[in-house]
Amino acid sequence: MKNIIFNIIIFSVLYNLLFVYNAKADSRLEYCEPYREQIIAILESEGLPSEYFYLAVCESRCKIDVVSNKGAVGLFQVTKPTYLHYKPSHCSKDDIDDLECNTRAAARYIKHLQHRFKDMKTLVKAYNRGGTNLIRKGSTREADGLSYCVMSYVKKYSTNKSNKIKTK
């Protein structure tokens, strides 16, 4: 029952945060198509709904080898410390750019964030900024005082969700 309620909350938060971002969202989704089923299968095997696929769309445009200026790597833009903490035991410390290892580490981190942040808006912002950084900013309930970049992240995420490629 909790999972059904959480999935409904995910959908409503994303639906209610729609902004005009359609052209970019469409191109991101097209680029992600070859990896979509594999990413969704991994997320679901880790106990997460398929909607978290859209984090990879927003974070990296599904580019496996992309590295941010902050050093975050791969599909889900996982930092090295986060990867090392949440990676599966069969993944080496150097597999951060591997599709499966990056996705599994991200999924495990998301599950950790679900326990810390009860509403979806804050969870998505915490994923982008880091849970500890979000808490340092003060109000995690509304994520007050966050940069424009992080605030627009939720807009990108929600728009990509609204243009979702049908899953199963």
Task: Please place each PLM-identified region on the residue numbering.
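Classical Sec-dependent N-terminal signal peptides that target proteins to the secretory pathway
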Residues: 1-25
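Catalytic glycan-binding domains that act on GlcNAc-containing polysaccharides
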Residues: 26-168
